[in-house]
Design a protein with these regions (language model features):
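S-adenosylmethionine
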Residues: 1-440
Length: 440
């Protein structure tokens, strides 16, 4: 049931890590800020050691991954529901429960540090409840967790129901299980993957990506980062650009291009890339990434749904904004911050982007549409609608030889559909959908 505790220190530093975790959890669940954004903007994290910062992140990620289980266990141990105005108490209980149930923290450390978080007049009269609930959880938690349906509890309806409809309940359960694990770190190399695999003690995956075990710490400290030898990119995220084939010497338009992993792929393959991104801040990050890698691309700050290309291109790649439900392993906040209304709004935006992207493709050229989403509404359903409206487009099915080691991810229609439970024993994949189209 438990994972190894990464911060057994229940002293001052342990308290500081948990205070930072509380601030981070509140930023996500109360102020509804994305996990990565909250990580970057929580001042309490800055003063922690690397080890304690990693623990604070792991603790909050564990709460977000297992929120359904944690809340069910807490509700079992509470005589009456916590009042809505006592949200901070609920967050402290969640952090304590995650340590007791899933991180292997000794009960005395989990309870005492949780009580320390509840000091002050705001929590007058609450410390007794906090102590009683967590001590009961320490006694009964193992049996409670063993009896839980973790897959169903941890997966909100807006995800569970479409997954069951699209993939079947067994696969939906496998997806939920995959989302509980920290993902490995995948890299794309500019060149010499064999050399960097040896230097980084990494596995070379069938598509050429490098895979390192989870828990590598700060990416910028790894060999090769400073010299621009590689960039972080999940193995599944590297597939859409590869579906364009040999792009050397060709003009390729990369729409919604930031943060630039696919732009880097295309530039490294010899393409003349035009990278279009609506957000100037994200475009700035893309340029910085390309500069680190020693790669070049023309960049345009514009809305890809309205921008007009200077001339039709031989290839267009559209990695559209989406719910990102395929990246829950890395972004567990998504399950709690998004919902059906977001998927509907994003689907409409994807239709607008696709309609404009088609106009940028010259006859005989290719369009690849991709989303890091598991929701059919954002993937195959968007392509079905596009094809119904454009007789000048035809699907170009993906051949098994194009995706060594990933043939299970090729759909009956010939599209690419990776799932987090693919390559499960080897660390899994992000959930991606990609379809390749040709303009007649």
């Amino acid at each position: 049931m438990n994972d190894p505790d990464q911060s057994g220190d229940a002293g001052t530093k342990g308290i500081d890590a948990r205070k930072a975790a509380l601030a981070l959890l509140r930023a996500v669940l109360e102020r509804r800020r994305p996990f990565d954004e909250a990580l970057a903007q929580t001042p309490a994290l800055n003063d922690l050691s690397t080890r304690d910062r990693a623990f604070a992140r792991l603790l909050v990620a564990s709460v977000l991954r297992r929120l359904g289980q944690i809340d069910a266990a807490l509700d079992h141990c509470l005589d009456r529901p916590i009042k809505p105005k006592d949200l901070i108490l609920r967050q402290i209980l969640r952090l304590g429960a995650a340590q007791l149930l899933f991180l292997g923290t000794p009960a005395h450390a989990a309870v005492s540090t949780s009580l320390e978080l509840a000091r002050g007049p705001r929590h007058a009269g609450q410390r007794g409840l906090l102590n009683a609930v967590l001590r009961r959880l320490a006694r009964e938690g193992e049996a409670l967790v063993a009896a839980q349906d973790d897959a169903r509890l941890n997966t909100p309806d807006w995800l569970w129901e479409p997954w069951c409809a699209a993939y079947g309940e067994a696969t939906a359960r496998a997806l939920a299980a995959a989302h509980l694990r920290e993902p490995p770190l995948d890299l794309s190399c500019k060149e010499s993957p064999d050399r960097w695999a040896k230097t980084l003690d990494a596995e070379i995956l069938p598509g050429g990506s490098l895979r390192l075990a989870a828990g590598q710490g700060e990416v910028a400290r790894l060999p090769g980062y400073g010299e621009g030898a590689w960039w972080v990119q999940d193995a599944a995220a590297a597939v859409p650009a590869r579906l364009l084939g040999d792009v050397a010497g060709k003009t390729v338009i990369d729409l919604c291009a930031a943060p630039g992993g696919k732009t880097a792929q295309l530039a490294a393959a010899g393409a003349e890339v035009i990278a279009v991104e609506r957000s100037e801040n994200r475009l700035k990050r893309l340029v910085e990434n390309l500069e680190r890698l020693g790669l070049g691309a023309a960049t345009v700050a514009a809305d890809a749904a309205a921008w007009q290309a200077p001339a039709p291109a031989e290839a267009v790649l559209l990695d559209a904004p989406c719910s990102a439900s395929g990246t829950l392993r890395r972004h567990p906040d998504i399950a709690h911050l998004k919902g059906p209304k977001d998927v509907a709004a994003l689907s409409a935006a994807q239709d607008r982007l696709l309609a404009n992207a088609v106009t940028m493709v010259k006859p005989g050229g290719l369009l690849v549409y991709a989303v890091c989403s598991l929701q059919p509404e954002e993937g195959s359903e968007r392509i079905a609608r596009l094809l119904s409206e454009h007789q000048d487009l035809e699907r170009v099915p993906v051949a098994p030889a194009e995706l060594p080691g990933m043939t299970d991810a090729i759909t009956a229609e010939g599209d690419f559909r990776s799932l987090p439970c693919h390559w499960d024993e080897g660390g899994g994949l992000d959930g991606f959908y990609a379809c390749r189209l040709k303009r007649r």
